[in-house]
Amino acid sequence: MLCAVYKSSRKADTYLFVNKRDCFDDVPQALLEMFGVPQLVMVFPIAKRESLGIADIQKVRAALEEKGFYLQIPPPQVNLLAEHRESLGIKD
């Protein structure tokens, strides 16, 4: 199975995986509106891949089979200053 990956024109480091290039039929309209104009990044055979950058390959495959798409959002940023202040017992 081929998988097409698109990056969001509105949200940084947000990617949408779909089963077919330029086929967004399974993606909810509200998600597409939030995502903005999809910009093609790559098309690859997902069955041959053992891993992906950030996303869990098994979760991506399962989502593509069940829902027809997978949305990858960036992990939350860690506030190192807040963690350090908390470790020192400093409260705002």
Curated annotation (Swiss-Prot):
Cite the InterPro entries for this sequence.
YcgL-like_sf, YcgL_dom
User: For the YcgL domain, which residue ranges apply?
Assistant: 1-85
Pfam families, sorted? YcgL
Protein name, as recorded = YcgL domain-containing protein Shewana3_2381
Species of origin reads Shewanella sp. (strain ANA-3)
Tell me which PANTHER family the record gives: PROTEIN YCGL (PTHR38109:SF1)
**What Gene3D superfamilies does this protein map onto?**
YcgL domain
